[in-house]
Amino acid sequence: VKWTDKERAVILGIFSGLDYEDIGPKALVRCLIVYPWTQRYFGAFGNLSSAAAISGNLKIAAHGVKVLHGLDMALQHMDNIMETYADLSILHSETLHVDPDNFKLLADCLTITIAAKMGHCFTPDTQIAFHKFLAVVVSALGKQYC
């Protein structure tokens, strides 16, 4: 993947302004509520019986933060995201058996959550760069499934 200087700046700018403790949980909670079938991977996380239960679940919140921090690896290795995520792809496919379509669902929920937080600053150009970044991450996480 080729990144322009502008794309790199936009992506790094988004993450430099993020409150991981806020955005990570909100994105994962949104995914689990909007796409309830994704909850099947979180059975050990406790009560997921309602939107309120999911929203108040501390294990879900902590995992949302972990997922968001996991994107830091991609930020640090933007020119080699596929290789950077090779082990995570194996983990999610062979150990956790996560449906790779769920990566895109979470990416969409993350985009919505960040756009809501950034408001008018989340311009179409910002979305283009961010979408490209997440598409590469989603592809890398799903690579083991091919």
From Swiss-Prot:
This is Hemoglobin subunit beta-2. Keywords: Heme, Iron, Metal-binding, Oxygen transport, Transport. InterPro entries: Globin, Globin-like_sf, Globin/Proto, Hemoglobin_b, Hemoglobin_oxygen_transport. Belongs to the globin family. This fish has just a single hemoglobin. It displays a weak Bohr effect that is not effector-enhanced and shows a propensity to form disulfide-linked polymers in vitro. Residues 2-146 form the Globin domain. It comes from Lycodes reticulatus. Involved in oxygen transport from gills to the various peripheral tissues. PROSITE patterns: GLOBIN. Heterotetramer of two alpha chains and two beta chains. Red blood cells. The gene is hbb2. Pfam families: Globin (PF00042). GO terms for molecular function: haptoglobin binding; heme binding; metal ion binding; organic acid binding; oxygen binding; oxygen carrier activity; peroxidase activity.
